A protein has these predicted regions:
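N-terminal positive-inside, membrane-proximal cytosolic segments immediately preceding the first
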Residues: 1-27
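Short solvent-exposed coil/turn linkers within tandem alpha-helical repeat scaffolds
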Residues: 75-84, 98, 112-121, 147-156, ...
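Extracytoplasmic/periplasmic C-terminal soluble domains
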Residues: 142, 146-202
């Protein structure tokens, strides 16, 4: 009798809760395999991006005719991918070497806008500021180097800020920026020493 009662209880339990249990199991399996698919898809995407990065950087180094267009397309289609951001940095360097500053600005700006890693974003910001200075877009460059950056880039940013302020004729502010560069750990290179000396003389 006890066994029969247990069976009946199981039947009643299953009748009341069976659909929910099945649904839970199905959802559980769905989530499990969904995450497995997501992980696999993510891995495959990263592997393709890595392969494209290696190919494109090699082509840029070799000066391939189609390298710039292919790199621009890759960066445009994958702005948040780290490999695409590395390609953008390489593309910008390639463009600067060929005095194509507009292409360099576009590539670096994409990294500044999309990079989730603060160091990647900071590196792109410093490089972009240098290109903007070369284009005489001093206000735009100044806004980049004055924004909060990781400590490792503070010295570079302060020196660039000094360069911009000196170019704008703000001697006292430029000197203060160079001093901050030294305090941030930037080495007193001959170039930085010359900049400070020129401000003293002026």
């Amino acid at each position: 009798v006890d066994e029969e009662q247990q069976v009946e209880r199981l039947k009643e339990f299953w009748k009341e809760h069976g659909k929910g249990i099945v649904a839970g199991v199905v959802i559980g399996f769905g989530l499990f395999y969904g995450w497995r698919y997501y992980d696999q898809h993510t891995l495959e995407t990263q592997e393709r991006a890595s392969s494209n990065y290696q190919q494109l950087t090699a082509e840029l180094s070799e000066g391939s005719e189609n390298a710039v267009l292919e790199a621009q397309e890759f960066v445009s289609e994958n702005p948040e991918n780290v490999y695409a951001q590395l390609v953008a940095l390489q593309l910008a360097q390639h463009a600067v070497e060929r005095t194509d500053l507009a292409t360099a600005v576009t590539a670096l700006q994409s990294v500044v806008d999309s990079a989730q890693d603060e160091n990647m974003s900071a590196l792109a910001s410093i490089r972009l500021a240098r290109v903007l200075i070369a284009q005489e877009q001093l206000d735009a460059a100044l806004s980049l180097v004055k924004k909060p950056l990781p400590e490792a880039y503070a010295g570079f940013a302060a020196e660039l800020e000094g360069d911009i302020l000196a170019e704008q004729g703000n001697t006292e502010e430029a000197r203060a920026a160079y001093e901050r560069a030294l305090q941030a750990g930037e080495s007193l290179t001959p170039a930085l020493q010359m900049k400070l000396n020129s401000l003293v003389k002026s």
